[in-house]
Amino acid sequence: MSKGIVLLAAGGTGGHVFPAEALAFKLKERGYSVHLVTDSRAERFAGKFPAEEIHVVPSATIGSKNPVAVARSLWTLWSGMRAAKKLIQRLKPVIVVGFGGYPTVPPLLAATRLGIASMLHEQNAVMGRANKALAPRVKAIAGGFLQESGDVFSDKTVATGNPVRPAILAAAEQPYHPSHPGEPFNLVVFGGSQGAQYFSKAMPTAISLLDDELRARLRVTQQVRPEDMEMVRGCVAQLQMGADIAPFFNDMAERLAKAHLVICRSGASTVSEISVIGRPAVLVPYPHALDHDQAANAAALAATGGAKVIVQSELSPERIASILSHVMNDPEKLSHMAAAAKLAGKPDAANLLADMVEAIAAGKTVSEFKRTRA
C-alpha cells in the first residue's frame, strides 16, 4: 500500500528534471506514489521518470516589458493555477516539491494556498527566479550549492546537494582510468540538456589544430543542437576522426564514466554529475545567465581542484587545442583532477533529500529536521 502521493514540479529542462527524477526513484523505493508536473519540453528527458502520471499545466514566464505580453502571461499563470488547484484537490498529495523553472509556479502557489506541505529544491549556487518568488511561501528549501547561513532564507534551508540519477550512481562505480600517450583519449563535450552552439563552432576548429598523433587518439562524444548537426558532421568527416555526434545521448552517464576529460557548461546538475562520477572537467559557464549561476556552480568545483574554469570570451579554438595538447600528455594531472572531483561529489544527496521530504510532509520544521541530522 502506498504511503501517499508526492507531487513533483519541474521545469522542462534536464537541469530541473534530472534531480527530480533521482528523488522520484528514492521515494518510490520508500513506498510513495510519484506524479510529475512539467511542460512539453520535458518529453525528451522524462522517458525514464518513474511517475504514475506526468501532468502538463499551463504556465508562463513574465520576462517581457510589453503590456500585452505581460497580460497574456498573467492569464496563463492564472489558468495554470486553476488547473493545478484541481489537480492537487484530486490527487491529495502529502507534499508538493518544486525543482525550479516557471512550470513550478502554478502547482506550488496552489499548494501553499490549499495548505498542502510544500518545499523547493534549488540546484544552483544562486537561486533562480521562480524559486526566489516561491521561497517566502514554502515550508523548506533544499540546496544543491546553496549555503545554510548568510541568506534571508537560511533558517529554512538545508544543504542536501543535488540528487543524481541511478545511472550516474552506477557510472560512479567505475574508477578513472587515465589515458597514456599513444592510447585512445575519450573526450566528452556537451552544453547541458539543450546543447551549446558555441561548442559546435569551436570544437571542430580546435581539433583541426591538433597534431596528427593527438587527433588520431581522440574519441569524441559531442552533444550538438539539431540545427548544427549538418555543419558539425561535415567538419568531423573532413577531419576523419572518431566521433559520436547527436542532439541528446540517453547513455550520457556511461559516456561520462569512460571520459578522460569533459568540456561542458556548468549547470548545477552537470557539475553535480561529473563530480559524483569523478571526472576532470573544463567548465565554461553560460555567459548570458541572468544571475551568473553557472559561474558560481563552476567556482565551487574549481575550488576543490576538480575542474578548470574558463569564461567563454577567453576560450578560443586555439586555447582549447592548447589545453588538449597539454592534458593528453599529462595523465597524472587528469588523475589528480578526477580524484579531487570525486571527493567533492555528494552521491547520497537523493537519500538526504528524500529524508527531508518525508520530514516536511510529516509536519516537522526545518529546525527539527536539522536536529535529527546532527
From Swiss-Prot:
Pathway where this protein functions: Cell wall biogenesis; peptidoglycan biosynthesis
Keyword Cell division: yes
Membrane topology, record value: Peripheral membrane protein
Cellular compartment(s): Cell inner membrane
Record InterPro entries: GlcNAc_MurG (IPR006009), Glyco_trans_28_C (IPR007235), GlycoTrans_28_N (IPR004276)
Single biological process term from Gene Ontology: cell wall organization
GO MF terms, alphabetically ordered: UDP-N-acetyl-D-glucosamine:N-acetylmuramoyl-L-alanyl-D-glutamyl-meso-2,6-diaminopimelyl-D-alanyl-D-alanine-diphosphoundecaprenol 4-beta-N-acetylglucosaminlytransferase activity; undecaprenyldiphospho-muramoylpentapeptide beta-N-acetylglucosaminyltransferase activity
Pfam entry (one): Glyco_tran_28_C
Predominant place of localization: membrane
Keywords on record: Cell cycle, Cell division, Cell inner membrane, Cell membrane, Cell shape, Cell wall biogenesis/degradation, Glycosyltransferase, Membrane, Peptidoglycan synthesis, Transferase
E.C. number(s) listed in UniProt: 2.4.1.227
GO cellular component: plasma membrane
Catalysis: reaction(s): di-trans,octa-cis-undecaprenyl diphospho-N-acetyl-alpha-D-muramoyl-L-alanyl-D-glutamyl-meso-2,6-diaminopimeloyl-D-alanyl-D-alanine + UDP-N-acetyl-alpha-D-glucosamine = di-trans,octa-cis-undecaprenyl diphospho-[N-acetyl-alpha-D-glucosaminyl-(1->4)]-N-acetyl-alpha-D-muramoyl-L-alanyl-D-glutamyl-meso-2,6-diaminopimeloyl-D-alanyl-D-alanine + UDP + H(+)
Sequence positions that bind UDP-N-acetyl-alpha-D-glucosamine: 13-15, 124, 165, 193, 294
Top-level EC class: transferase
Family statement: Belongs to the glycosyltransferase 28 family. MurG subfamily.
Protein role: Cell wall formation. Catalyzes the transfer of a GlcNAc subunit on undecaprenyl-pyrophosphoryl-MurNAc-pentapeptide (lipid intermediate I) to form undecaprenyl-pyrophosphoryl-MurNAc-(pentapeptide)GlcNAc (lipid intermediate II).
PANTHER family for this protein: GLYCOSYLTRANSFERASE (PTHR21015:SF22), UDP-N-ACETYLGLUCOSAMINE--N-ACETYLMURAMYL-(PENTAPEPTIDE) PYROPHOSPHORYL-UNDECAPRENOL N-ACETYLGLUCOSAMINE TRANSFERASE 1 (PTHR21015)
Protein name (record): UDP-N-acetylglucosamine--N-acetylmuramyl-(pentapeptide) pyrophosphoryl-undecaprenol N-acetylglucosamine transferase
Organism of origin: Rhizobium etli (strain CIAT 652)
